[in-house]
Design a protein with these regions (language model features):
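Conserved non-transmembrane functional hotspots
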Residues: 1-139
Length: 139
């Protein structure tokens, strides 16, 4: 009887872990989709900024503190860029580079939180990734 109870407990824990993993992947993907939409046209609007608070709140429910902090940095940078002017703001190239860098840090924290790897992506690889993305966006 004890073994059966233990097996049931393990199966339930496994299902819970699987569901949590799926939820985390979904919220991380949603955040990347929102940020991608913002950066694709090179402009930020109030409507775009307003899409971020609820994913941040959901992160607090699901993600590690490191993930939350990393995304807050992205959000803070987007707010800083948007705060410069009026209703629709053009994102300067230097601001895009910083946003991409922060998104790369966020991505790395997501990777660790999902236990894809307990080793962070090499900082040099992150730097090259940001450089490649920045170069591609200038064309």
């Amino acid at each position: 009887m004890f073994l059966l109870n233990k097996q049931t407990e393990i199966e339930q824990e496994s299902k819970k872990s699987e569901r949590l993993f799926d939820e985390k992947v979904n919220i991380y993907q949603k955040i990347f989709d929102i940020c991608s939409d913002m950066l694709m046209d090179g402009k930020l609007s109030q409507d775009e900024i307003n899409r971020l608070p609820f994913p941040l709140i959901k992160l607090q429910m699901l993600a590690s503190e490191d993930v939350i902090i990393a995304f807050q940095e992205v959000f803070n940078e987007l707010n800083r860029v948007y705060d410069v002017e009026g209703e629709v703001v053009t994102i300067q190239d230097s601001d895009k580079v910083e946003i991409y860098r922060l998104l790369s840090v966020f991505s790395n924290e997501c990777r660790k939180d999902l236990e894809i790897s307990d080793v962070p992506v090499d900082p040099e690889i992150q730097k090259m990734t940001v450089s490649t993305i920045s170069s591609a966006n200038k064309k």
